[in-house]
Amino acid sequence: MAVPKKRTSKSKKKIRETVWREKANQARIKAFSLAQSILTGRSKSFYYTTTEKDSNLSE
């Protein structure tokens, strides 16, 4: 016969949610830092291509 599982306590649920939020926050900070370094031109380890718009292409 099936037996219902015990409930997860509020404190354990809150701890898990806090850990998840902290991981998301760290990813946000890292992405923002990378974006800043790219925009300021100080990035030495990230390569990207830039496209220049020609006036001939739009005509």
UniProtKB/Swiss-Prot annotation:
Domain of life: Eukaryota
The entry's keywords: Chloroplast, Plastid, Ribonucleoprotein, Ribosomal protein
Cellular compartments per GO CC: chloroplast; large ribosomal subunit
A Pfam short name: Ribosomal_L32p
GO biological process annotation, one example: translation
InterPro entries: Ribosomal_bL32, Ribosomal_bL32_plant/cyanobact, Ribosomal_zn-bd
UniProt GO molecular function: structural constituent of ribosome
Subcellular location: Plastid, Chloroplast
Record keyword RNA-binding present: no
Sequence similarity: Belongs to the bacterial ribosomal protein bL32 family.
PANTHER family: 50S RIBOSOMAL PROTEIN L32, CHLOROPLASTIC (PTHR36083), LARGE RIBOSOMAL SUBUNIT PROTEIN BL32C (PTHR36083:SF1)
Protein name as catalogued: Large ribosomal subunit protein bL32c
Naturally occurring in which organism (per UniProt): Physcomitrium patens (Spreading-leaved earth moss)
Organism ancestry: Eukaryota, Viridiplantae, Streptophyta, Embryophyta, Bryophyta
Underlying gene: rpl32
